[in-house]
Amino acid sequence: MNHFMKIIFSFCLLTVCLLPLSAQEKLQPKALIIMIDGMRADAYDNIPMPNLEKLRAGKWQPGYQAAFTLTGYNIEDARPNSAPNHASIATGVTATKHKVFKNGQTKDGNFEEWPSWLARLATSPQHYKTQFLYSWGENKDTAKHPDVPFRKGKDPENGDYLCSLYASPDGGPDATLFFIGEVDHSGHSDGFYPHSQKYINTAIETDVIIGKLLDTIAARPTFANEDWLILITSDHGGYGKSHGMLGGHANTIPILMVGKHITQGTLPGLPRNYDMPVTALAHFGVDVKPLNLDGHVIGTEVSKIQRRPLKEGLLAYLPFDTETPVNVAPNGLEIAVVGQNIKSGVDGGKLDKCLRIPGGENVRECIVLKNTEYLKLENSNNFTATMWVRLPPTHVGNPPIFSNKDWRNGARPGFVICGARNINNPTNPGVHFNFGRWHDTHRTDMGIYDITPDEWVFYAVTVTPEGVACFCQGQPDGQFYWIVDGSIKDANLDSGMTWNIGQDGSAAYRYNLQGDIDDFALWNRGMTVDELREIFQAGRQNHDLGSLLK
């Protein structure tokens, strides 16, 4: 071989070596969907789960990124229970199509017309290997198919079995659906919200199971030639020791997506758990458009909302540290005091002094934010309100804490954060959020949150530019909870009334708030859960909002 030919040969060899792997050998698609039964979205932040956190941070393996949301949602055409959502996570369609509307109906599901994503892959021309693992007995009928192996067992046993499959000489399944059930069991026995210690412990144990799976996958000798998609979600959350209720506690779920083609960041809007199987099918090259599925392919687009200075859009900041309440927000709203017995500058506030509002029936004592009848809000309905509230063990009626609506009818335009009754125990007061809608239902009610009587508790409401209402609570023990709702897109917040603290928009509601308020703030824009959590955590460290505005 002459010198010139040697140069040409060497150049060609070098070019081949430098080609992307996709040009030399196509990466083999693999997918794992994990459903953690009963996992609330806020559990991800309140409970230490290092393996999930590593995934969320995009630090699992080189080349893999993560998209995540703290405001995922489950199906809406059935109550937020296990069987309907399990069927949706398996098939990518909601209850109207798969016909599982409640627990006990799985055996009669319409899975011939709407098979699972595993069955679609198992019967594809590629005949992908599949596996379904579960612990709840009813799942034996969840989209059952003869070409999809099913395995029932306890969560740790199923995890170990799946690890053995992934480590086997034949490489195990290409596509796996793993339902983990013990978190739900702990919620039922000891409590979903507030997070019971057993619920916390079981979530940590679940994280260990997932960590073993991640390590096993990364240790595969073929891992470098594989293209993994790992999707983690939940079927429902819970309140007290139950789920199935409307109002957000059982609807708000986490969604975590990890893969080479995922964009690092926060998923926009209100993604659904039934987006998971559709995204997994697309990962294997399946054209999902003709399938008429209800879920969508997600994970490549993330939220473009940029964090803004906290003082931007601030309309009111009332620390209530002086006898005459003052709005210290620059160019903020004017305020007026209604009543003779409402007092500002009262000792014993959360951060310094506070506002004390006398309660009772036919009492008119409140703070009016003047000229807010037709307040200009970003995107017509975006706003954020934060406050610390101390309520007594009992109160009369369902008094407004902050409102701009005629609260005599919850379907009327406007909103209210109000004292209400606990869902399970009518003698224990709670707090909930209501807003009017243009829709036929005319109202949405979020919550209820339990209170710790005579303790300072943090509350926040925000409506984001992506059409999500988020209602948050920060408890004295440091736990930060949130629930979400997407019907705010058709909210009717223009009541033509002022925004008032301690009363409804008319300032004449029959039941006046009895309680204390500290460090109240209002913005004409939305915020993220992360921002609201930071305000709460600062307050727990005795730093008022003013210190964050500097």
Residue ranges of model-derived segments:
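Short, structured active-site-proximal loop/turn typified by the sulfatase FGly-forming signature C/S-X-P-X-R
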Residues: 42-84, 92, 315
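Metal-dependent active-site segment of extracytoplasmic phospho-/sulfohydrolases and closely related
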Residues: 33, 51, 205-246, 280, ...
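Histidine-centered active-site microenvironments of extracellular/periplasmic hydrolases
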Residues: 231-261, 486-487
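Extracellular glycan-associated modules
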Residues: 307-550
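Active-site His/acidic residue clusters
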Residues: 138-150, 162, 166-208, 212, ...
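Active-site-proximal N-terminal segment of extracellular/periplasmic enzymes that hydrolyze or transfer
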Residues: 24-61, 332-334
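Non-catalytic, well-ordered alpha-helical segments in soluble enzyme domains
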Residues: 269-303, 524-525
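Long, well-ordered early-domain segments
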Residues: 52, 59, 81-138
